[in-house]
Amino acid sequence: MRLDTRFLSGFPEALSRHGPLLEEARRRLLAKRGEPGSMLGWMDLPEDTETLREVRRYREANPWVEDFVLIGIGGSALGPKALEAAFNESGVRFHYLDHVEPEPTLRLLRTLDPRKTLVNAVSKSGSTAETLAGLAVFLKWLKAHLGEDWRRHLVVTTDPKEGPLRAFAEREGLKAFAIPKEVGGRFSALSPVGLLPLAFAGADLDALLMGARKANETALAPLEESLPLKTALLLHLHRHLPVHVFMVYSERLSHLPSWFVQLHDESLGKVDRQGQRVGTTAVPALGPKDQHAQVQLFREGPLDKLLALVIPEAPLEDVEIPEVGGLEAASYLFGKTLFQLLKAEAEATYEALAEAGQRVYALFLPEVSPYAVGWLMQHLMWQTAFLGELWEVNAFDQPGVELGKVLTRKRLAG
């Protein structure tokens, strides 16, 4: 993966000038590593070979699964959904109950064969209202159709020791995977939260974690080679711009921008240590689709954005565009490939946004592979953690969501 800042003049000088600030931010972050409550366990997930073996054993023991239902919300669903959509090679059908709307829930229940369905309830705390509600609905369905065999069709992913979901799993003798204590939900994509669904999707888990290890390596590298420090500085230098657009040029990665939005917004939209409100608003975008939706605004709307484009440099396979008689208007496409068109559109949009005066940079992926995407996702986690230090906020809590939970309970109890 490489960073391109060709349209941001002066960035190399800014990197040198802000070197001490970045080094201090990294030092402060790493000084917390290993401390109880630091929530930095995501750094160690790429090295967790025991969990990888456990996930694989479970997958091998359950070859009958044709439909995989993940019940979870927020970080419990966004990471798995992004990765599974990109790398599902198994034919297993995936369904995400990351909502509490009754109509689509009932539609899903009516289409599934319970004998061939595995339900995975995911919640770090084990008390997430949406997850428990969905679990209760599916539990009733499983018991009604399968009797005492329902336990074979339910697996949970939750805290190692605590919470209602862990207690329920132990009481019922269910298989339960542990989300490490020091790993928060939005940083959990490379824990069993993501690895278990990906095992059923047939994805290359070794390559995914190898890419994440590459991100760890670059995060700890000298400043000139530390990609996460560089991109964190880009966001820091543009923190006066309220909008951060994350635009990915890959249909397979269509769910990745939503994962990034949660990672960025929930980690960094905070009251800082001086009592000031800080943060920028991440906006998801997908190329080339959003060239026909949002790019008009990006080009001629307010110059209030920092845009990051994620562009693959090569395809894993390609399709030639054939010549078609009567479509001479498309002759410039004939003989080219779909990826050549995708790459040309991405590069053209990159240049057009810069020409319009928007602040824009690109991250070029070698290809959309488990290795490259593991690198990218772990890189973005490091970027977020470094920004937490630069912006003087705790990037690993979310106090702003608690009142909504309290008021929801109050309304239901009343």
Swiss-Prot record:
GO terms for cellular component: cytosol. Keywords: Cytoplasm, Gluconeogenesis, Glycolysis, Isomerase. It is found in: Cytoplasm. GO terms for biological process: gluconeogenesis; glucose 6-phosphate metabolic process; glycolytic process. Its main location: cytoplasm. SUPFAM superfamilies: SIS domain. It is an enzyme of class 5 (isomerase). InterPro entries: G6P_Isomerase (IPR001672), Phosphoglucose_isomerase_CS (IPR018189), SIS_dom_sf (IPR046348), SIS_PGI_1 (IPR035476), SIS_PGI_2 (IPR035482). Gene3D superfamilies: Glucose-6-phosphate isomerase like protein, domain 1 (3.40.50.10490). Pfam families: PGI. It catalyses: alpha-D-glucose 6-phosphate = beta-D-fructose 6-phosphate. Pathway: Carbohydrate biosynthesis; gluconeogenesis; Carbohydrate degradation; glycolysis; D-glyceraldehyde 3-phosphate and glycerone phosphate from D-glucose: step 2/4. The active site is at E266, H292, K405. Its EC number is 5.3.1.9. One of its GO terms (molecular function) is glucose-6-phosphate isomerase activity. Catalyzes the reversible isomerization of glucose-6-phosphate to fructose-6-phosphate. Belongs to the GPI family. This is Glucose-6-phosphate isomerase. It comes from Thermus thermophilus (strain ATCC BAA-163 / DSM 7039 / HB27).
